[in-house]
């Protein structure tokens, strides 16, 4: 049986990160999606193109996605044949995240609707078009999913994670002293261990 993993990186990440996960995913080919825009209506075409290319060549397709990459994956591939997904610090509710950012920026939806875009002090540009797109394109996600979450994640709330877990076929692993971006030696070792276990369970199904 031929198996492949599609890897979708997060903001500021790289498709080359897929290489560092190969050691955790023995028996799988792995391909990273090289994208640089962060608008779902653009990224979806790149993700769909890669999926379409590998669909006929592999018996099973798995996903690994990081942060906003999880949102892009769910939006694009929700109706596709995915055996299992592994999400790292995932954006699971994009509308909730945008509304949180609106609050953090001390502006209102009305302000955003009138201005179209609002830059923030924390480096993100709020977009009314983006918020409308998210609301007009709800996601139905039925893929078995493993989630790795950090207790000190300053972007995604535990409440959002727990809500997703309760409404989906998903399992949660938490590194309590981890951060949204897993980057220290300790955090990366935890991530590697989690991924190896999740892949082993997956591949035995």
Can you annotate each of these PLM segments?
Residues 1-39:
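Short, surface-exposed "cap/lid" segments of acyl-processing enzymes
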Residues 2-3, 58-60, 83, 143-144:
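Short coil/turn segments at beta-strand junctions that form active-site/ligand-binding loops
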Residues 15-22, 44, 157-162:
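Short, surface-exposed alpha-helical segments at coil->helix boundaries
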Residues 32-57:
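Catalytic nucleophile-loop/oxyanion-hole region of alpha/beta-hydrolase
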Residues 60-65, 88:
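Short beta-strand immediately N-terminal to the catalytic nucleophile in serine-hydrolase-like folds
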Residues 64-73:
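Gly/Ala-rich beta-loop-alpha elbow adjacent to hydrolase catalytic centers
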Residues 76-80:
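Aromatic pocket-lining residues of Rossmann-like dinucleotide-binding sites
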Residues 81-205:
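The alpha/beta-hydrolase serine catalytic core
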């Amino acid at each position: 049986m031929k198996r492949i993993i599609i890897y979708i990186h997060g903001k500021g990440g790289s498709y080359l990160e897929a290489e560092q996960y190969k050691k955790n995913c023995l028996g799988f080919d792995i391909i990273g999606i090289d994208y640089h825009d962060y608008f779902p209506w653009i990224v979806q075409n790149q993700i769909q193109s890669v999926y379409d290319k590998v669909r006929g060549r592999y018996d099973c397709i798995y996903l690994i996605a990081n942060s906003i990459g999880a949102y892009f994956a769910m939006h694009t591939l929700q109706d596709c044949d995915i055996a299992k997904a592994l999400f790292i610090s995932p954006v699971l509710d994009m509308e909730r995240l945008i509304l949180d950012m609106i609050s953090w920026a001390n502006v209102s939806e009305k302000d955003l609707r009138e201005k179209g875009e609002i830059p923030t002090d924390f480096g993100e540009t709020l977009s009314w078009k983006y918020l409308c797109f998210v609301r007009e394109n709800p996601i139905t996600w039925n893929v078995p999913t493993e989630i790795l979450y950090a207790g000190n994640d300053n972007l995604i709330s535990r409440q959002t994670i727990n809500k997703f877990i309760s409404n989906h076929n998903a399992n949660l692993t938490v590194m309590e002293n981890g951060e949204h971006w897993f980057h220290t030696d300790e955090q990366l070792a935890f991530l590697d261990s989690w991924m190896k276990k999740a892949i082993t369970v997956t591949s035995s199904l």
